[in-house]
Amino acid sequence: MNIGRMAALLKMMLLKLFREPAYIFLMLLFPAMLTIMFGFIFGDPEFGMSMNVTAPGLFAYACIFIIMTVAQSFADMRDQGLLKRLNTTPMKSSDFMGSEIISNMILVILQVIIVYVLALPFGFTPDTNIFGILLAFLLMIVFSLSSVGLGLITATISKSSGIATGISFIFILPQMFFGTFMPVTSTTKPIASLMPSYHATQALSAIFSGDLTNPQVITGFTFTAIASIIIIILGIFLFKKFGNK
């Protein structure tokens, strides 16, 4: 792995992302609009909910949505022949994958900052210290690895970026409805417990409540980290073996 090559690739990928209006909307403006919409709905005490309950799910959803953009990006690069051209250069696959992972981590940090700042005026009052805030950011960065891995798996089984967009929702929707936005019941909990998003959301809720010693923080962080590492390794393996053709 070469740091110089990774830095050059990282710069290229970030410039490519921010030159595309669709990517800017999906990655930055959409989380902002969703936060504002949820703020107006759930920030009103008449609805019996608060942004303190909703915000952890918004943070997780921002990371989940990366699945689609990663799948689109890799499918586009494959369709344009960019990946094959990279194979003829001194660039190693580890440099390419490393820069892709880092670029998405940067986007996750931006998304989390946007959601955090916009949620504050709507009554989001995290009862934690600076360590808790940093821990929440770290948790979202770790969680983003699973989304990158699922994006790679989606790109592997998709013949085009358009198909990748549709298939990505196979991974997005279950994580949205099982423990991120929708309350978990005794019926849905066995399914939700398999979702990294559920454990990440539960850990975030405990962190923002100020209870850093809550077992949900440790178990949520541990499950999310292990699941994310397994998924990203599987995604890289499948894409290198079957998707880069």
Task: Indicate where each model-derived feature is located.
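Short hydrophobic, aromatic-rich alpha-helical segments embedded in or entering the lipid bilayer
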Residues: 3-9, 181-221
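Hydrophobic alpha-helical transmembrane segments of multi-pass membrane transport/permease proteins
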Residues: 16-44, 51-71, 108-111, 168-177, ...
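Short alpha-helical transmembrane interface motifs in multi-pass membrane proteins
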Residues: 19, 23, 52, 63-68, ...
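Alpha-helical transmembrane segments of multi-pass membrane transporters/translocases
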Residues: 37-39, 202-245
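Transmembrane helix segments
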Residues: 37-45, 155-198
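Alpha-helical transmembrane segments and their short interhelical loops
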Residues: 93, 97, 101-166, 173, ...
